[in-house]
């Protein structure tokens, strides 16, 4: 593993389904984050890194749907779904990543990211985005908690 992090906040809604928690935490991007992601997509496209559009970022996550492993959950593929955790992510030629949203018994919500790079482009990309990633994930989780969504 080339990178691993975890952020956690208290849960105000311990009975909430993990898909709803995922949507509450990751489905409410501030406008500046959307702009950064779209700019990143344009810059990385020549390297073969698939990006996102404003349309991709505007689509809400359907929390009423029953998701199965292999389905798209938001922008990423669902790799695992359990009562208290879902894992999404994406694999490409430069790096693979996973995002875990876990509800523990305390009750707390833990959002973790794991990244495995495959080549120099993946390592360079990871090094470039890490400061934004750390700030962004902490902000998304904190905002979701402060707003009472999780």
Label for each model-derived stretch:
Residues 115-136:
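A short acidic/glycine-rich loop-to-helix N-cap element
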Residues 102-121:
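Short acidic, glycine/tyrosine-flanked loop/strand segments centered on an H-E-D-like triad
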Residues 145-150:
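Short, highly charged C-terminal tails/helix-capping segments
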